[in-house]
Amino acid sequence: MDLRHLIQDVPDFPKPGILFRDISPLLRDPDGWDEVMRQLGDLCTELKPDLIVGIESRGFIVGTALATNRKIGFVPVRKPGKLPGDVLGIDYSLEYGSDRLEIHADALQGHPRVLLVDDLLATGGTARATVELIEKAGGDLVGCGFVIELAALGGRQQLPVEIPVKSLIIYS
């Protein structure tokens, strides 16, 4: 099933010159969403993760649905100050500034096999930082899954070459 027709292009959002790829129509379409879960579920069958890690915020939507579907746990990676208790964090650079991501310090104890999921792979900065955070927390990253990849922005090249990356929709 081709999922592209369920992605809405929103020009000039969140600022002029940006073409935002909105997954909201995909989320509303039960057949389309089922196809997302099937394809990412196939990735889980292949890679056998113990946990799904999702990046705030749309990665939570994809990740919790997939984790529930596969009957495995979910771990959120959040913006700073959103998780109670002890956390591990990583600072990373953006095109125009910097940001920080955090994970519970004990979330990946025991070196679980981790699949990282998010709605979008663009420049790869956030995904790369999350990969580093997973490793810092003790997880064994076995793969990455994305609903959309903006290939022209080179995000895939920011991820470890030995890690399988699956994107369901690729825009060149």
From Swiss-Prot:
Pathway: Purine metabolism; AMP biosynthesis via salvage pathway; AMP from adenine: step 1/1
InterPro entries: Ade_phspho_trans (IPR005764), PRibTrfase_dom (IPR000836), PRTase-like (IPR029057), UPRTase/APRTase (IPR050054)
SUPFAM superfamilies referenced in this protein's UniProt entry, alphabetically: PRTase-like
Tagged with keyword Glycosyltransferase: yes
Localization annotation: Cytoplasm
One of the record's GO cellular component terms: cytoplasm
EC number: 2.4.2.7
PROSITE patterns: PUR_PYR_PR_TRANSFER (PS00103)
Pfam family, one: Pribosyltran
Keywords: Cytoplasm, Glycosyltransferase, Purine salvage, Transferase
Main location: cytoplasm
Catalytic activity: AMP + diphosphate = 5-phospho-alpha-D-ribose 1-diphosphate + adenine
Enzyme class: transferase
PANTHER family referenced in this protein's UniProt entry, alphabetically: ADENINE PHOSPHORIBOSYLTRANSFERASE
Role played: Catalyzes a salvage reaction resulting in the formation of AMP, that is energically less costly than de novo synthesis.
Protein name (record): Adenine phosphoribosyltransferase
Species assigned in the record: Prochlorococcus marinus (strain MIT 9313)
Taxonomic path: Bacteria, Bacillati, Cyanobacteriota, Cyanophyceae, Synechococcales
Gene name as annotated: apt
